[in-house]
Regions:
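Short helix-capping/linker turns of helical repeat alpha-solenoids
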Residues: 36-38, 52-53, 72-75, 88-90, ...
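N-terminal leader/linker segments that initiate helical-solenoid repeat arrays
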Residues: 18-50
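Bacterial N-terminal signal peptides
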Residues: 8-17
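TPR alpha-solenoid repeat register
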Residues: 41, 78, 114-116, 149
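Terminal, low-structured helical/coil segments at or just beyond the last alpha-helical repeat
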Residues: 137-159
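Hydrophobic face of amphipathic alpha-helices that form TPR/SEL1-like repeat modules
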Residues: 44-51, 81-88, 92, 117-124, ...
Length: 159
């Protein structure tokens, strides 16, 4: 009986601490910095919402909102993240044209993953004019050290 009372008390304490911790994310320094316009903090807040970490609830719409705010300030990682969100349909429907748009923004800022993902979108579109552009993005991603891009480029050239 003592064991069950102790276990019950422990579970209730843990539940209370988790609730209290998650309710206070709006008061933390990072959130306040994000609200004041700090682009790095905006990206971090978005990642916390995306993954449900650091006391933030998992909320794709809030993640998308904060990534969009950081993206408008030119943050390539936020733009890449928006590409992922729209490509996978996190928090809504998949939107390939928006994914391509955000990947292109980040790719133009030399973001290696965005360059790879943009190339893959172009390759999957099956349009012949896109093959040349896709190869160019794969080459750029390869120069950025993206191994998957190097492999894909080799695969295309061997066809």
């Amino acid at each position: 009986m003592f064991f069950f009372k102790t276990l019950n008390f422990f579970c209730l304490s843990l539940l209370f601490c988790t609730y209290t911790y998650s309710a206070t994310y709006k008061k933390n320094n990072e959130f306040q910095l994000a609200k004041s316009g700090n682009v790095d903090a905006q990206y971090n807040v978005a990642m916390n919402f995306l993954n449900g970490e650091e006391g933030y609830p998992k909320d794709y719409n809030q993640a998308k909102r904060w990534f969009e705010i950081a993206s408008k300030q030119g943050d390539a990682s936020a733009q890449n993240a928006l590409g992922i969100i729209y490509l996978r349909g996190l928090g809504g429907d998949k939107d390939l044209s928006k994914a391509e748009y955000y990947y292109r923004l980040a790719a133009n800022k030399n973001h290696g993953n965005a360059q790879l993902q943009l190339a893959l979108i172009l390759l999957n579109s099956k349009k012949s004019d896109n093959l040349k552009e896709a190869k160019e993005w794969l080459e750029k991603a390869s120069l950025n050290g993206n191994i998957e891009a190097k492999d894909k480029l080799r695969e295309i050239e061997n066809k």
